[in-house]
């Protein structure tokens, strides 16, 4: 009697804003793609190229795309300075978003948006829910912050556009462990120490990415690190200890 391999149904979740931005800047070059009447299309072209590739590669039973909505973010209620350094979306990109959404609707792909939340917040919730339902989940995002969601059944796929061609790299729990020497959830602790200039999140002065990773590898969490400092059991020196 042969025992067959049970294949899990697949769920693909796409960070719409992240992939749209990556497509826009990846194909911008010296002259952006336009239609005959001058409408910009480089983000549309790049987004759809990435979408079609993941559909071909994974053949998911379920798929959804999450986008950010304008308005006050819940994260700003926790920290007012969140993304305060960000400029608005370029007009050349903004005018392509409705076209991308129109194509997604024509393809019968769900678009998910929620006031107060960013697309990656939505994806995180859906990914964990899908995993609990026994699905094999792939998150398509250009944001490595998504690595904190990686598990045995949740894979983060990072696209790269080179010379108009899309390449991807997958990160599951094993890949994150190999790359960082940490569990995916511990990357949150790393971010707390190093901060994130792109999101205007301050970190600990004098602590960069390599130091932050090393500290969490050694002390496992920010809480445990500070407990060791308070008790004098740490081996930090100079500015690391002062801050």
Regions picked out by a protein language model, each given a short descriptive name:
Residues 7, 59-64, 109, 132, ...:
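Non-catalytic nucleic-acid-binding/docking modules located in mid-to-C-terminal regions
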């Amino acid at each position: 009697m042969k025992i067959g391999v049970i294949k899990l149904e697949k769920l693909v979740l796409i960070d719409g804003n992240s992939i749209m931005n990556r497509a826009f800047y990846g194909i911008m070059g010296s002259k952006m793609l336009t239609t005959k009447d001058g409408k910009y299309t480089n983000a549309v072209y790049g987004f759809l190229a990435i979408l079609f590739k993941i559909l071909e590669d994974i053949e998911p039973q379920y798929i959804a795309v999450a986008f950010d909505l304008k308005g006050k973010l819940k994260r700003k209620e926790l920290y007012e300075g969140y993304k305060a350094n960000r400029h608005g979306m370029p007009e050349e990109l903004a005018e392509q978003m409705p076209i991308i959404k129109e194509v997604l609707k024509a393809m019968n792909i769900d678009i998910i948006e929620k006031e107060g939340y960013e697309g990656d917040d939505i994806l995180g919730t859906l990914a964990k829910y899908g995993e609990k339902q026994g699905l094999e989940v792939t998150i398509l995002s250009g944001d490595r912050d998504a690595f904190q969601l990686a598990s045995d059944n949740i894979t983060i796929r990072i696209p790269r556009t080179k010379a108009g061609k899309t390449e991807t790299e997958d990160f599951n729990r094993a890949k994150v462990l190999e790359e960082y020497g940490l569990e995916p959830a511990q990357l949150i602790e790393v971010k707390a120490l190093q901060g994130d200039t792109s999101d205007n999140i301050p970190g600990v002065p004098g602590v960069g990415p390599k130091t932050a990773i090393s500290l969490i590898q050694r002390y496992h969490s920010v809480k445990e690190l500070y407990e060791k400092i308070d008790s004098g059991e740490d081996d930090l020196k100079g500015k690391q200890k002062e801050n």
